[in-house]
């Protein structure tokens, strides 16, 4: 339904009608549309491929960019995130869940990638984890909101280049 209608047009009533259950059944599990969609996003993020060692910082950053783009800028993400972010921002409990799951899990994954790069001698430390995550997510959201027609492959390359720039003191690959 989300892919068909998008986040803004999705309603609890519509979900109940389509699934053949009472609206109260849905509200017993989720207090709002945003919570219901958040759980769907958690499920979707579980289906993303793991961040395996690609053998280089550049390869690992490309893998991170691919995951972020798949989640946020894939067909479903483009239909969810623009409306979801606004609703979530007005719900402190949901924002806390978002921070404690997607944000912290992402930060832990990025830390592991940067630790591998330190072991390979490509980076001196892992201090840029929070900055890197902010650039990755912020850039993808900005591009999804303001460049909605951008091809996923081009977006992934842009995000990987921005990530490399963060870690290399602002220099982008030639």
Regions found by a protein language model. Name each.
Residues 3-7, 27-37:
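HTH DNA-binding helix-turn interface
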Residues 49-81, 132:
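Hydrophobic alpha-helical connector segments
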Residues 29-30, 98, 102, 141-142:
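Tryptophan-centric aromatic hotspots in well-structured domains and transmembrane helices
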């Amino acid at each position: 339904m989300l892919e068909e209608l998008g986040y803004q047009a999705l309603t609890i009533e519509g979900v109940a009608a389509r699934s053949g259950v009472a609206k109260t059944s849905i509200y017993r599990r989720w207090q709002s549309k945003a919570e219901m969609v958040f759980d769907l996003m958690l499920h979707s993020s579980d289906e993303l491929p793991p961040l395996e060692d690609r053998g280089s910082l550049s390869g690992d950053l490309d893998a991170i960019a691919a995951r972020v783009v798949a989640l946020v800028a894939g067909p479903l993400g483009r239909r969810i995130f623009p409306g979801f972010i606004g609703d979530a921002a007005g719900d402190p409990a949901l924002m806390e869940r978002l921070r404690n799951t997607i944000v912290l899990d992402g930060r832990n994954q990025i830390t592991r990638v940067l630790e591998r790069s330190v072991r390979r001698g490509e980076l001196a430390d892992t201090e840029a984890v929070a900055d890197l995550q902010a650039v990755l997510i912020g850039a993808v959201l900005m591009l999804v909101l303001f460049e909605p027609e951008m091809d996923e492959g081009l977006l992934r390359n842009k995000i990987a280049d921005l990530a490399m720039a963060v870690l290399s003191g602002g220099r982008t690959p030639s």
